[in-house]
Protein backbone atom coordinates (compact mmCIF):
# COMPACT_ATOMS: atom_id res chain seq x y z
CA UNK A 1 0.00 0.00 0.00
CA UNK A 2 1.44 3.34 -0.99
CA UNK A 3 1.85 5.89 1.76
CA UNK A 4 1.44 9.53 0.87
CA UNK A 5 0.83 12.81 2.56
CA UNK A 6 -0.75 16.05 1.46
CA UNK A 7 -0.12 19.59 2.63
CA UNK A 8 -1.16 22.97 1.33
CA UNK A 9 2.20 23.90 -0.26
CA UNK A 10 1.87 27.66 -0.45
CA UNK A 11 0.69 27.94 3.12
CA UNK A 12 3.28 25.47 4.36
CA UNK A 13 6.18 27.30 2.74
CA UNK A 14 5.09 30.71 3.95
CA UNK A 15 3.51 30.13 7.33
CA UNK A 16 4.77 26.78 8.58
CA UNK A 17 2.86 23.78 9.82
CA UNK A 18 -0.09 25.49 11.52
CA UNK A 19 -1.81 26.74 8.36
CA UNK A 20 -1.09 23.55 6.40
CA UNK A 21 -3.10 21.42 8.80
CA UNK A 22 -6.70 20.29 8.98
CA UNK A 23 -9.14 19.65 11.76
CA UNK A 24 -11.15 16.44 11.88
CA UNK A 25 -13.62 14.78 14.22
CA UNK A 26 -13.16 11.37 15.80
CA UNK A 27 -14.20 9.43 18.86
CA UNK A 28 -11.85 9.73 21.82
CA UNK A 29 -10.70 6.90 24.08
CA UNK A 30 -13.17 8.25 26.66
CA UNK A 31 -16.04 7.66 24.24
CA UNK A 32 -17.00 11.24 23.37
CA UNK A 33 -16.24 13.14 20.18
CA UNK A 34 -13.07 15.22 19.93
CA UNK A 35 -11.83 17.85 17.48
CA UNK A 36 -8.28 17.06 16.35
CA UNK A 37 -5.81 19.46 14.73
CA UNK A 38 -2.95 18.15 12.62
CA UNK A 39 -2.61 15.68 9.73
CA UNK A 40 -4.72 12.53 9.94
CA UNK A 41 -2.72 10.63 7.30
CA UNK A 42 0.54 11.40 9.09
CA UNK A 43 -0.86 10.31 12.46
CA UNK A 44 -0.09 13.82 13.69
CA UNK A 45 -2.24 15.33 16.41
CA UNK A 46 -1.06 18.70 17.62
CA UNK A 47 -0.89 19.22 21.36
CA UNK A 48 -1.07 21.78 24.14
CA UNK A 49 1.28 23.37 24.95
CA UNK A 50 2.04 23.79 21.25
CA UNK A 51 0.17 24.54 18.03
CA UNK A 52 -3.15 23.44 19.52
CA UNK A 53 -3.04 26.67 21.51
CA UNK A 54 -3.50 28.64 18.25
CA UNK A 55 -7.21 27.91 18.46
CA UNK A 56 -9.68 30.01 20.37
CA UNK A 57 -12.62 27.73 21.08
CA UNK A 58 -13.90 25.52 18.25
CA UNK A 59 -17.70 25.34 18.21
CA UNK A 60 -19.54 22.12 17.39
CA UNK A 61 -23.10 20.99 16.77
CA UNK A 62 -24.62 17.53 17.09
CA UNK A 63 -27.14 17.18 14.25
CA UNK A 64 -29.96 14.80 15.12
CA UNK A 65 -33.58 14.11 14.22
CA UNK A 66 -34.32 15.07 17.83
CA UNK A 67 -32.89 18.54 17.24
CA UNK A 68 -29.49 20.20 17.15
CA UNK A 69 -27.25 20.50 20.23
CA UNK A 70 -24.35 22.97 20.21
CA UNK A 71 -21.31 23.25 22.47
CA UNK A 72 -17.81 24.70 22.56
CA UNK A 73 -14.88 22.32 22.59
CA UNK A 74 -12.97 21.95 25.86
CA UNK A 75 -9.21 22.03 25.30
CA UNK A 76 -7.28 18.98 26.41
CA UNK A 77 -3.69 17.90 25.80
CA UNK A 78 -4.35 16.58 22.27
CA UNK A 79 -7.62 18.08 21.08
CA UNK A 80 -10.90 19.73 21.99
CA UNK A 81 -13.33 17.41 23.77
CA UNK A 82 -17.06 17.64 23.06
CA UNK A 83 -19.86 16.71 25.49
CA UNK A 84 -21.57 14.44 22.95
CA UNK A 85 -20.90 11.88 20.24
CA UNK A 86 -22.77 10.93 17.08
CA UNK A 87 -25.06 7.91 17.35
CA UNK A 88 -26.38 6.02 14.32
CA UNK A 89 -28.12 8.42 11.95
CA UNK A 90 -26.57 11.50 13.57
CA UNK A 91 -23.65 13.71 12.58
CA UNK A 92 -21.43 16.37 14.14
CA UNK A 93 -20.11 19.55 12.54
CA UNK A 94 -17.39 21.79 13.98
CA UNK A 95 -15.46 24.90 12.98
CA UNK A 96 -13.09 27.54 14.31
CA UNK A 97 -14.28 30.86 12.91
CA UNK A 98 -11.75 32.85 14.93
CA UNK A 99 -8.42 31.32 14.00
CA UNK A 100 -5.92 34.23 14.20
CA UNK A 101 -5.42 36.25 11.04
CA UNK A 102 -1.89 36.23 9.65
CA UNK A 103 0.07 38.32 7.13
CA UNK A 104 2.55 37.29 4.47
CA UNK A 105 4.48 39.05 1.74
CA UNK A 106 7.31 41.55 1.50
CA UNK A 107 7.47 45.23 2.35
CA UNK A 108 4.27 47.06 1.49
CA UNK A 109 2.89 44.05 -0.38
CA UNK A 110 1.32 42.31 2.61
CA UNK A 111 -1.63 39.95 2.28
CA UNK A 112 -3.85 39.45 5.30
CA UNK A 113 -5.24 35.91 5.39
CA UNK A 114 -7.82 33.98 7.36
CA UNK A 115 -7.50 30.21 7.83
CA UNK A 116 -11.01 28.80 8.37
CA UNK A 117 -10.97 25.11 9.37
CA UNK A 118 -14.13 23.02 9.62
CA UNK A 119 -15.09 19.37 10.00
CA UNK A 120 -18.00 16.96 9.81
CA UNK A 121 -18.40 13.43 11.18
CA UNK A 122 -21.02 11.06 9.78
CA UNK A 123 -22.25 7.65 10.90
CA UNK A 124 -23.78 6.62 7.55
CA UNK A 125 -24.34 8.02 4.06
CA UNK A 126 -27.88 9.31 4.60
CA UNK A 127 -28.34 12.60 2.74
CA UNK A 128 -27.72 15.68 4.87
CA UNK A 129 -28.13 19.43 4.55
CA UNK A 130 -25.24 21.92 4.61
CA UNK A 131 -24.27 23.36 7.98
CA UNK A 132 -20.78 24.73 7.27
CA UNK A 133 -19.63 27.45 4.88
CA UNK A 134 -17.53 24.84 3.05
CA UNK A 135 -19.14 21.48 3.68
CA UNK A 136 -18.62 17.89 2.51
CA UNK A 137 -21.94 16.05 2.69
CA UNK A 138 -23.16 12.50 2.15
CA UNK A 139 -25.73 12.37 -0.64
CA UNK A 140 -27.62 9.21 0.27
CA UNK A 141 -25.50 6.99 -1.99
CA UNK A 142 -22.69 5.00 -0.29
CA UNK A 143 -19.29 6.49 -1.12
CA UNK A 144 -20.73 9.61 -2.76
CA UNK A 145 -20.08 13.07 -1.31
CA UNK A 146 -21.13 16.55 -2.34
CA UNK A 147 -18.97 19.62 -1.77
CA UNK A 148 -20.99 22.74 -1.01
CA UNK A 149 -19.79 26.33 -0.59
CA UNK A 150 -22.18 28.90 0.88
CA UNK A 151 -25.05 26.50 0.26
CA UNK A 152 -24.25 25.88 -3.43
CA UNK A 153 -22.48 22.93 -5.10
CA UNK A 154 -18.78 23.59 -5.74
CA UNK A 155 -17.69 22.01 -9.04
CA UNK A 156 -14.23 21.10 -10.35
CA UNK A 157 -12.62 21.03 -6.92
CA UNK A 158 -10.16 18.43 -5.64
CA UNK A 159 -11.23 16.16 -2.80
CA UNK A 160 -8.71 13.88 -1.08
CA UNK A 161 -9.67 10.71 0.78
CA UNK A 162 -7.15 9.41 3.35
CA UNK A 163 -7.00 6.32 5.58
CA UNK A 164 -5.06 5.81 8.80
CA UNK A 165 -2.03 4.25 7.07
CA UNK A 166 -1.50 7.43 5.06
CA UNK A 167 -2.78 5.99 1.76
CA UNK A 168 -4.83 8.54 -0.12
CA UNK A 169 -6.80 8.98 -3.31
CA UNK A 170 -7.83 12.19 -5.04
CA UNK A 171 -10.81 12.97 -7.27
CA UNK A 172 -12.45 16.09 -8.67
CA UNK A 173 -16.04 17.13 -8.09
CA UNK A 174 -18.38 17.20 -11.07
CA UNK A 175 -20.69 20.06 -12.08
CA UNK A 176 -23.02 19.23 -9.18
CA UNK A 177 -20.13 19.23 -6.71
CA UNK A 178 -20.32 15.44 -6.37
CA UNK A 179 -17.51 12.93 -6.09
CA UNK A 180 -17.47 9.18 -5.46
CA UNK A 181 -14.87 7.04 -3.71
CA UNK A 182 -14.54 3.30 -3.24
CA UNK A 183 -13.97 2.40 0.41
CA UNK A 184 -12.72 -1.20 0.48
CA UNK A 185 -11.20 -1.20 3.98
CA UNK A 186 -12.89 -1.09 7.33
CA UNK A 187 -11.87 1.71 9.67
CA UNK A 188 -11.59 5.48 9.51
CA UNK A 189 -11.69 7.54 6.32
CA UNK A 190 -11.11 11.30 6.27
CA UNK A 191 -12.04 13.29 3.15
CA UNK A 192 -10.70 16.82 2.74
CA UNK A 193 -11.38 19.75 0.42
CA UNK A 194 -10.33 23.39 0.37
CA UNK A 195 -11.47 26.60 -1.24
CA UNK A 196 -9.95 30.07 -1.45
CA UNK A 197 -12.12 33.20 -1.39
CA UNK A 198 -10.28 36.39 -2.39
CA UNK A 199 -13.24 38.74 -1.94
CA UNK A 200 -11.78 40.23 1.23
CA UNK A 201 -13.64 41.84 4.08
CA UNK A 202 -13.56 42.47 7.80
CA UNK A 203 -14.46 40.38 10.82
CA UNK A 204 -15.01 41.50 14.40
CA UNK A 205 -11.92 40.65 16.44
CA UNK A 206 -11.26 41.59 20.09
CA UNK A 207 -8.15 43.55 19.08
CA UNK A 208 -9.95 45.34 16.25
CA UNK A 209 -7.55 44.04 13.59
CA UNK A 210 -10.19 42.22 11.61
CA UNK A 211 -9.53 43.17 7.98
CA UNK A 212 -8.50 40.36 5.64
CA UNK A 213 -7.78 39.85 1.94
CA UNK A 214 -8.24 36.09 1.60
CA UNK A 215 -10.20 33.38 3.38
CA UNK A 216 -8.73 29.90 3.03
CA UNK A 217 -11.39 27.31 3.88
CA UNK A 218 -10.36 23.74 4.69
CA UNK A 219 -13.06 21.21 5.52
CA UNK A 220 -13.04 17.48 6.31
CA UNK A 221 -15.50 14.63 6.61
CA UNK A 222 -14.86 11.60 8.83
CA UNK A 223 -16.54 8.24 8.36
CA UNK A 224 -15.76 5.00 10.21
CA UNK A 225 -16.65 2.03 7.99
CA UNK A 226 -17.70 -0.94 10.14
CA UNK A 227 -16.88 -3.65 7.60
CA UNK A 228 -14.47 -4.40 4.78
CA UNK A 229 -10.88 -5.52 4.28
CA UNK A 230 -8.65 -5.36 7.34
CA UNK A 231 -6.85 -2.00 7.15
CA UNK A 232 -3.11 -1.41 7.38
CA UNK A 233 -2.38 0.11 10.81
CA UNK A 234 -1.38 3.73 11.25
CA UNK A 235 2.32 4.44 11.45
CA UNK A 236 4.05 5.69 14.60
CA UNK A 237 2.52 8.86 16.01
CA UNK A 238 4.25 11.97 14.66
CA UNK A 239 5.73 14.41 17.17
CA UNK A 240 3.58 17.52 17.70
CA UNK A 241 5.02 20.87 16.66
CA UNK A 242 6.03 23.37 19.30
PLM feature spans:
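Bacterial N-terminal signal peptides that target proteins for export
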Residues: 1-6
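N-terminal signal peptide c-region/cleavage motif recognized by signal peptidases
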Residues: 14-17
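Beta-strand-rich domain onsets/edges
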Residues: 21-32, 106-143, 201-242
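Beta-strand-rich structural segments
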Residues: 31-44, 137-149
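Short amphipathic beta-strand segments in non-cytosolic proteins
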Residues: 58-68, 157-171
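Mid-chain, structured segments of secreted extracytoplasmic proteins
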Residues: 63-110
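Glycine-centered loop-to-beta-strand initiation motif
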Residues: 76-82, 173-187
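A short, solvent-exposed beta-strand micro-motif common in secreted/extracellular proteins
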Residues: 90-97, 188-196
Amino acid sequence: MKKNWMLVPALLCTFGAAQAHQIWLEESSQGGAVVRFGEFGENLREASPGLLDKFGKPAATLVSAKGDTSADGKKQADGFALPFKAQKGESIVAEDARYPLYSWGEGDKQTRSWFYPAARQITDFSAQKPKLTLDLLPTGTPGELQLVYQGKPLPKTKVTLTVQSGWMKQAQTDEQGRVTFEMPWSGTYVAEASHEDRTGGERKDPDGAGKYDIVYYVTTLTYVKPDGIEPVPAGPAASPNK
